[in-house]
Regions:
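The feature primarily captures lumenal catalytic ectodomains
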Residues: 1-234
Length: 234
């Protein structure tokens, strides 16, 4: 998103080095590679704490609309989605892989340090129900970044627990059907993202079965009969 801002005013190829706050995660380096960034130009501010430069170019936040960062984070503008599609969908290679039309996002591979505090306690029942409805369970952490883009771009129905994986909704085709499981205080960032991308969004909102430790923490139990009805109504 910040690169989009830079592209409008400077030639990115003229930049000697790009400083990022973190490049530890696999998808970070993969996305930069797809954007044709040379690994020799990528610096992590965690490793390089003090730098000296003749010219330093810094971007502002790409969508700071108000003085409320919580509100701004939940209202991603359409131009960001359009830019992501423009940059990454064009890199998808035509292949014979048969991507599933219905996917369930399994978060058991989540690298979040609080993932153990946010689980679906009846997930086995959910997976059994979705399997009968021809859903394929997908662990995003097992996939490359471009494979994740392919899965979401080819999907017609997506179900999953609120989490960072839903950022890939940016790559969905219009009218893709979404069901998000979330707690009462999670916010509407995924719903707003789906709306901006013209997706058909639905949610199942649950109270935590145990004491919640924060807005996004606490185990939940999904009402199977409600999920079954929402799936059949799609």
């Amino acid at each position: 998103r910040r690169l989009k801002i830079c592209e409008k005013v400077i030639n990115l190829e003229s930049i000697d080095y790009f400083i990022f706050p973190d490049t530890k995660k696999r998808f970070q380096l993969e996305t930069l590679r797809e954007l044709n960034f040379s690994s020799n130009k990528i610096l992590s501010s965690e490793k390089f704490r003090h730098l000296k430069a003749e010219e330093l170019i810094i971007t502002n936040h790409p969508y700071n609309f108000t003085d409320d960062p919580h509100y701004d984070a939940q209202h991603i503008p359409k131009w960001i989605i359009q830019w992501l599609k423009e940059k990454f969908l064009k890199n998808l290679k035509s292949n014979t892989k048969n991507y599933p039309k219905n996917i369930y996002i399994d978060r058991s591979d989540s690298e979040s340090n609080v993932s153990h505090l946010r689980k679906i306690i009846n997930e086995k029942e959910i997976i059994e129900l979705l399997k009968r409805e021809k859903f394929t369970t997908v662990r995003l952490g097992d996939l490359s970044f471009l494979d994740q883009v392919q899965y979401f771009n080819n999907a017609e129905r997506i179900v999953g627990l609120h989490g960072a994986g839903f950022a890939n909704l940016s790559f969905c085709k219009e009218k893709t059907k979404i069901i998000e499981f979330r707690m009462t205080d999670t916010g509407k960032v995924i719903e707003n993202l789906a709306d901006t991308n013209n997706l058909e969004f639905n949610s199942i909102i649950c109270k935590p079965v145990s004491h919640a430790l924060g807005a996004q923490l606490g185990h939940i139990k999904i009402p199977i009969e409600i999920l079954d009805k929402k799936i059949k109504d799609q």
